[in-house]
Regions:
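Solvent-exposed loop/turn segments at secondary-structure junctions
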Residues: 42-45, 62, 69-72, 97-102, ...
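Conserved beta-strand hairpin/beta-sheet module of binuclear metal-dependent hydrolase folds
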Residues: 30-77, 165-178
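Short catalytic-loop micro-motif centered on adjacent basic/acidic residues
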Residues: 63-67, 90-94, 151-152, 217
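Short, electropositive alpha-helical surface patch
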Residues: 226-241
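Bacterial Sec-dependent N-terminal signal peptides
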Residues: 1-21
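Metallo-beta-lactamase
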Residues: 23-25, 30-31, 61-62, 69-70, 116-157, 160-230, ...
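Active-site metal-binding motif and surrounding structural segment of the metallo-beta-lactamase
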Residues: 59-61, 72-116
Length: 241
């Protein structure tokens, strides 16, 4: 009886810990295979607004793409990943210079996680006195972590001058970050650093390079509809007319 009671308490404790990853502050959703989407929230125009990131579980640790927008969720995300997969995050890539992508770079660097941005993102963050990555991606690069290969790609300006996408060839997952607008979006969102004239060209280059993705992940809102690239072009057409 004592052993059974201890087991039950341990189970409930573990369930409680992982339950924190779906309490409204941090949501983790399985995408496919070893891919997971994490979503956190911040107030945008007076309303809680979701920001998406991705992590990939490999034999050599977990790769994180972008960091939580909500700064209180930097550690809970690491804890949830460790609890669910019994693996540590070994790498974090931020896809552009805004805080919903780079906010956790310093925190994760202090945790011994290798942090990366492009040279362009690094220089923008440096000029603004914001979080900096430890490692710089000088050009489009293919990484290998564990059994997975993935590619960073800069197609041009759009939501920001430095926005990149990340392509996971084996599973045909295209992580677009804020360069790609969700089908749920009614407008282009934050345009403070945007280049709306170049943005359509950038999207079309991505469509030409990565054909027929199985999954397309935008930086905000719903990510379950693969027509978000076309939707982004439609929003840009409406904005630019």
């Amino acid at each position: 009886m004592k052993i059974a009671t201890i087991f039950l308490l341990e189970f409930l404790f573990s369930f409680s810990l992982f339950g924190q990853s779906n309490n409204g502050l941090l949501q983790i959703t399985h995408l496919t295979g070893d891919f997971y989407i994490f979503t956190t929230y911040k107030n945008y125009q007076g309303t809680p607004f979701p920001a998406n990131g991705l992590y990939l579980v490999t034999d050599d640790g977990v790769v994180m793409i972008d960091s939580p927008w909500d700064t209180t969720q930097f550690q809970p995300l690491l804890d949830s990943i460790k609890l669910k997969h019994n693996k540590d995050v070994v790498m974090c890539i931020a896809t552009h210079s805004h805080e919903d992508r780079t906010g956790g770079l310093n925190y994760y660097r202090q945790k011994g996680i290798k942090t990366y941005t492009t040279e362009q993102t690094y220089q923008i963050c440096k000029a603004k006195g914001e979080n900096l990555a430890e490692y710089i991606i000088q050009k489009d690069t293919t990484f290998k972590v564990g059994q997975y290969f993935f590619e960073t790609y800069y197609a041009g300006a759009g939501h920001s001058p430095d926005n990149i996408v990340i392509w996971f060839e084996k599973n045909k997952v295209l992580y677009g970050g804020c360069l790609i607008k969700s089908v749920e979006a009614n407008d282009l969102g934050n345009l403070s650093d945007a280049n709306t004239k170049e943005w359509p060209k950038t999207i079309k280059k991505i469509q030409g390079k990565f054909e027929a993705p199985n999954y397309v992940i935008p930086g905000h809102q719903n990510w379950t509809d693969n027509s978000s690239l076309d939707h982004t072009l439609q929003l840009l057409k409406q904005h630019n007319k």
